[in-house]
Amino acid sequence: MIIVLSPAKSLDYDTPAHVPSYTQPAFVDDASELIDGLRKLSPQDIATLMDISDPLARLNFQRYADWSPTFTPANAKQAVLAFNGDVYEGFDAKSLSAADLDYAQQHVRVLSGLYGLLRPLDLLQPYRLEMGTRFASARGKDLYAFWGDRITRALNEQLETRSGAARVLINCASTEYFKSVKPKLLAAPVVTPVFEDWKGGRYKIISFHAKRARGLMARYIVENRIAEPAALKDFALEGYAFDAAASNDSTYVYRRRIGE
């Protein structure tokens, strides 16, 4: 089983890592190519391209200038400990044991506009480059064209080491990021957990809650060493429960109703 997550825009480089082990990202050459292009942009170009404020644009202009193809603990941090958004509040890697992080290293992958595909302990230098950004390169008009089938092939290398019901990809990523994966080329079926909350008289996906729940699901898989998707139906954290009637073989729906 491989679980894919989206990255986070919010980053934490202030909290010291609680584990010393780290690995190197696989697509450094590709990231370097993107950085070369990003360095040609002015802060105003970055603000326009990414629809961000001028202070954020200046911050990322400097990040691109400082970025190095050499990753060390002095200039980078393990990805799953650096990301700090809603998904990662749910995953809460800072409280996982070294053994749990080692397990996550084998089973969790993070999709990234700059880095392509990251393992949890891969070193990450700070950046901002969302997968949906229409940043053109020699490979095409946007980042989906830039990455092509590279991410899918990298996932297949991992999936092909699994067998039986354990050869499955659990999609805990957003639509924007999962578009970088080509399901028809995957060497395994895909199961997508969907989290809905009761609001306004019906169940609906509420972005903040759904992001956190996807992180909770990834943590649940890691902590319980879950190998087959059927076991995910027992997930029942923070009030969510599996809804068999709303689910099918490729979409597992979890719902909760808190108050009215």
From Swiss-Prot:
Source organism, top-level taxon: Bacteria
The similarity annotation says: Belongs to the UPF0246 family.
Which processes are annotated in GO (biological process)?
Answer: response to hydroperoxide
Read off the HAMAP family from this record: UPF0246
Name recorded for this polypeptide:
UPF0246 protein Bcep1808_2308
The record, for PANTHER family, names: PEROXIDE STRESS RESISTANCE PROTEIN YAAA (PTHR30283:SF4), PEROXIDE STRESS RESPONSE PROTEIN YAAA (PTHR30283)
One cellular component GO annotation, for this chain's record?
Answer: cytosol
Disulfide-bonded cysteines: none
UniProt cross-references to InterPro entries, sorted A to Z: YaaA (IPR005583)
